[in-house]
């Protein structure tokens, strides 16, 4: 939309003229068996509340839903306790007890017709596990790339670890569906 006059209307509101080039943004789009009400897609991004204050993250996404977004995603969500990035705070979906707070978030995303998405993450070489004290797992045995320069060393994953990682993603995906999410992004 573009302003049709600099001064606006007599009522003091700006007059907007429709620009047909942008109509495609307001069209529905099919994603597999689902349909998004428009093409406005809120990518996964953190707000700092994470598991400590999931209600703040839910309310932030509720505002986006009210604003008319077609697809709204959570922030990066840790899906296993061997992949946490303390001191940074993210959402968690380690076990079933994490489902209720994420269910509330999915419900708030959907209240105005948006599709709710969750990003499931395994931080690997970026996860120092300061909270859980687990030895980090990564493709290779290298120092963890933290922002705090702490001396943490990753263990190279073997075939058993890779099978476990796949199982952890499957379990987290099932929990995501139970929580009411429509879309899942693996990271």
Q: Predicted segment positions?
A:
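N-terminal capping/small domains of soluble enzymes
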Residues: 1-123, 130, 154, 165, ...
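Short coil-to-beta-strand
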Residues: 69-80, 136-144, 183-186
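Active-site regions of oxyanion-processing enzymes, predominantly non-cytosolic
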Residues: 116-118, 177, 184-186
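Non-globular sequence segments
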Residues: 121-181
């Amino acid at each position: 939309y573009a302003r049709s006059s600099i001064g606006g209307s007599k009522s003091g509101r700006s007059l907007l003229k429709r620009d047909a080039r942008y109509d495609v943004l307001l069209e529905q789009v099919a994603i597999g068996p689902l349909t998004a009400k428009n093409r406005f897609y809120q990518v996964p991004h953190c707000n700092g509340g994470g598991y400590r204050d999931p209600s703040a993250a839910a309310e932030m996404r509720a505002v986006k839903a009210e604003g008319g977004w077609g697809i709204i995603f959570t922030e990066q969500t840790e899906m296993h306790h061997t992949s946490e990035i303390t001191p940074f705070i993210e959402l968690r979906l380690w076990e079933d007890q994490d489902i209720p707070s994420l269910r509330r978030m999915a419900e708030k995303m959907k209240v105005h017709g948006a599709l709710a998405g969750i990003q499931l993450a395994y931080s690997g070489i970026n996860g120092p596990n300061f909270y859980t004290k687990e030895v980090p797992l990564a493709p290779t045995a290298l120092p963890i790339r933290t922002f705090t320069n702490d001396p943490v060393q990753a263990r190279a994953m073997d075939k058993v670890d890779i099978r476990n990682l796949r199982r952890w993603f499957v379990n987290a995906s099932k929990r995501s569906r139970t929580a009411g999410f429509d879309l899942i992004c693996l990271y």
